[in-house]
């Protein structure tokens, strides 16, 4: 057993802000020119990671990244899209969220296997989950430490450590 491993263990090396500190992953090969125009910036962000800026991706990207760092489920984004009169199906929302996650523009956070949130803040950080109102909140402390990390099996490496601390109101 190792004594302690700093958590978070993996950090993003590219810190270029796009629409409220969303960063293009280092493997993207180019940095988009930011204008402050959400529509333009989403277009550049998608192209920088090799995704075609379709109407659906552009509209969902604008809804996702235009409001700053946040945590959304597919259902929450679908509801926002419906209110904004964006013609997309729930399946398209799921597909787009998964594509953006695979491209490194979103981070997927699972809460007890029943609820999955998509985080626009892809930097290494952890979360509080507020059980009473089903809300995910970033933990700002960069010095969290995981004590007694088990040995990693031969042939494997740690890709990422996710910590979700569940909270409920005192009774």
For each feature predicted by the language model, list its residue ranges.
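Short helix-capping/hinge SLiMs at alpha-helix to coil transitions
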Residues: 51, 66-70, 84
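Basic amphipathic alpha-helical segments that dock to polyanions
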Residues: 93-103
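Non-DNA-binding regulatory cores of transcription-related proteins
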Residues: 103-171
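C-terminal regulatory/oligomerization modules of transcriptional regulators
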Residues: 1-39, 142-171
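Short alpha-helical segments that sit at the start of domains
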Residues: 27-59
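Short amphipathic alpha-helical elements of helix-turn-helix/winged-helix folds
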Residues: 45, 62-67, 80
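DNA-recognition alpha helix
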Residues: 73-85
């Amino acid at each position: 057993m190792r004594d302690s491993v700093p958590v978070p263990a993996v950090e993003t090396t590219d810190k270029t802000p796009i629409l409220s500190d969303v960063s293009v992953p280092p493997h993207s090969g180019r940095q988009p020119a930011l204008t402050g125009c959400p529509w333009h910036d989403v277009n550049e962000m998608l192209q920088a990671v090799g995704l075609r800026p379709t109407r659906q991706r552009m509209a969902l990207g604008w809804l996702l990244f235009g409001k700053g760092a946040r945590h959304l489920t597919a259902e929450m984004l679908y509801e926002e899209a419906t209110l904004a009169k964006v013609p997309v199906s729930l399946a398209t929302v799921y597909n787009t969220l998964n594509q953006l996650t695979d491209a490194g523009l979103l981070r997927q956070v699972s809460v007890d296997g029943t609820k999955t949130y998509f985080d626009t803040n892809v930097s290494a950080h952890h979360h509080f989950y507020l059980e009473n109102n089903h809300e995910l909140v970033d933990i700002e402390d960069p010095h969290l430490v995981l004590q007694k990390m088990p040995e990693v099996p031969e042939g494997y490496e740690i890709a990422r450590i996710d910590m979700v601390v569940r909270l409920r109101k005192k009774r």
